[in-house]
């Protein structure tokens, strides 16, 4: 194991450079927010009422709301861990097709998670709004924390989708280059000559004239005729 000898060498190491990437920082925030959402409702999300020992969800006694938050938070946390592991191997991926497929999968999942967290935020906030006040002695702070970090998860997943889209644009497969021109995606390639394309070739023969010969100066193309000298008669 290599131990850095100075702070400059530590800052230039691969591990630090990997942690400083915007994609890595975003994934860390996604994992932390997901962990807060599902742990808050998993520990304090189920409480019993004063007149009954049976546990109920603190979000309007709707067990679906608590189950949704716990399940979505846990799956999102696992997704962040899996993509962090794949990001560490991104530089070792040699195949262009596999790398493009990985980036496309990252973009699709980021968009899906942004939609899931948006729907979850609306659902949890609605259930909390219809919850009777002071029905449960504990758990109100956990419910508010889960709803707040559900909203924050929407923002980080949208930013993750934006980063994945930028990677797709910058790492387009060769020989294609993708440019965003006034909202439209343009694909440009270098044209290759085909067998049916007309090619101007000089023809040979006694009756053929080339462009180069026609472009010569009149002095070279039209030689002067010899002059006849008149001799005096003695």
Swiss-Prot record:
Key word Calcium present: no
Gene Ontology annotations for the cellular component aspect, listed alphabetically: neuromuscular junction; synaptic vesicle membrane
Cell location: Membrane
Family annotation (Pfam families): MARVEL (PF01284)
All residue ranges annotated as the MARVEL domain in the record: 18-169
Membrane topology: Multi-pass membrane protein
Positions of transmembrane segments: 25-45, 66-86, 104-124, 145-165
Swiss-Prot/TrEMBL keywords: Membrane, Transmembrane, Transmembrane helix
Domain of life, per lineage: Eukaryota
PROSITE patterns: MARVEL
InterPro entries xref list: Marvel, Synaptogyrin
Family: Belongs to the synaptogyrin family.
The protein, known as: Synaptogyrin-4
